[in-house]
Amino acid sequence: MLGRQRIWWHLLPLLFLPFCLCQDEYMESPQAGGLPPDCSKCCHGDYGFRGYQGPPGPPGPPGIPGNHGNNGNNGATGHEGAKGEKGDKGDLGPRGERGQHGPKGEKGYPGVPPELQIAFMASLATHFSNQNSGIIFSSVETNIGNFFDVMTGRFGAPVSGVYFFTFSMMKHEDVEEVYVYLMHNGNTVFSMYSYETKGKSDTSSNHAVLKLAKGDEVWLRMGNGALHGDHQRFSTFAGFLLFETK
């Protein structure tokens, strides 16, 4: 063991021999590059000054997208905006559900009494030629209220009011002309006239709206000529109440 230690102590100076040779050679013949080529691997000089910053390199490739961040806090309430324009009318919505029954209403005022129903219509089923007399109609189709007298051919007003009357008469073919008058309490309201040569028939009509008092009478009076009457009822007389008056 002691012998080995002695050998190491004799070899130790040999380890520093290359370094010393490099130093001597460098001192005797320096190169333009600094250290001799044979000592570039075993000799190191002092640190040099820091160099200048080089130009920026090209942009690198895009990085991987980061994770989605958390939602931020609600911002402060903004100022009220200006009033907008009126929008278009929307579509009709669905029908709502049926509501509940409301409370019973109060008792109402007495209603208007129903109007009296008055109407008649008569016709000639046979010829008539009694001049200057009231026309007696052989058939009565309608007589609501029975205010038309079938025996006299006269209508008696049961209430004061406004009445409508109409009549249509066919001239008999044996005469050329015929006159019929609408009478009101013995006074002529208007006339009906029809003319046609013998052998031919002709039909004429007229209408009236009269204000009658209760008890007034209205009828038709025959003038000259003759009227045609048969089952087809060409000659008729009708009237009805429009409304009552006070």
UniProtKB/Swiss-Prot annotation:
Basic and acidic residues composition bias: residue spans: 80-107
Biased composition (Pro residues): 55-64
SMART domains xrefs: C1Q
Record's compositionally biased regions (Low complexity): 65-74
Keywords associated with the record: Collagen, Secreted, Signal
Stretches the record annotates as Disordered: 53-112
UniProt-recorded Gene Ontology molecular function terms: identical protein binding
GO biological process entries: ERK1 and ERK2 cascade; glucose homeostasis; negative regulation of gluconeogenesis; phosphatidylinositol 3-kinase/protein kinase B signal transduction; positive regulation of adiponectin secretion; positive regulation of cytokine production; positive regulation of ERK1 and ERK2 cascade; positive regulation of phosphatidylinositol 3-kinase/protein kinase B signal transduction
Domain Collagen-like: 51-113
One Pfam short name: Collagen
This protein's GO CC annotations: collagen trimer; extracellular region; extracellular space; protein-containing complex
Subcellular location: Secreted
Signal peptide: 1-22
Protein name: Complement C1q tumor necrosis factor-related protein 3
Annotated organism of origin: Mus musculus
Gene transcribed to yield this protein: C1qtnf3
